[in-house]
Amino acid sequence: AKIYTRWFFDLAKSGGPRVNYQAVGSGSGRKAFIDQTVNFGASDDPMKDKDIAKVTRGLVQIPMVGGTIAFGYNYDCDLKLSQEKAVQVAMGMIKDWKELGCKPGKLTWTHRSDGSGTTKAFTNSMEAFSKTWTLGTGKSVKWPAGVGAKGNSGVAGVIQNTPGAIGYVNQSYIKGNVKAAALQNLSGEYVKPTVEAGAKALNGITLDE
């Protein structure tokens, strides 16, 4: 959402039209587009045939930008997560930071409470990481534990204000007390969600036609 806010700010500043863009989550945004209460939307999760069929005015989907999703956390630890440990954290199975090689302390899992393309992408990864993951994939899932918050900003806010909290957010929300964990990739290396790492990953994908 931040990049669209910046683009539309620059557009208005240069004499162009003013665009009212609101980050409401992919679930709400998709419904608003289908109901024709907005002119366009953006999501990390492209619309599928079932929803496209509901758009009577027609639909064009354009790949715009790519980004990374981070495990953001607020704790005194240089956190490195294996794929298995990442899944266990997100499943609410890990309650203490010592289980992740950090000093002992309460771990609080934080997740999205609204329908979210970020959640869809995140759960896709969790399912690919380990058979331990049993929540399926989607814009929303039934989290067995943790604190829910609306939007990337909401999750980042909980982490920022809760020592010992960890959750998933877009890379652009990694700031202040919210640090990014290094996550194990397919090669076994531990990588942080930087612009460079994200660009390298995006160069290796093939977009659907």
Report each predicted region and the residues it spans.
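Exported/periplasmic ABC-transporter solute-binding proteins
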Residues: 1-209
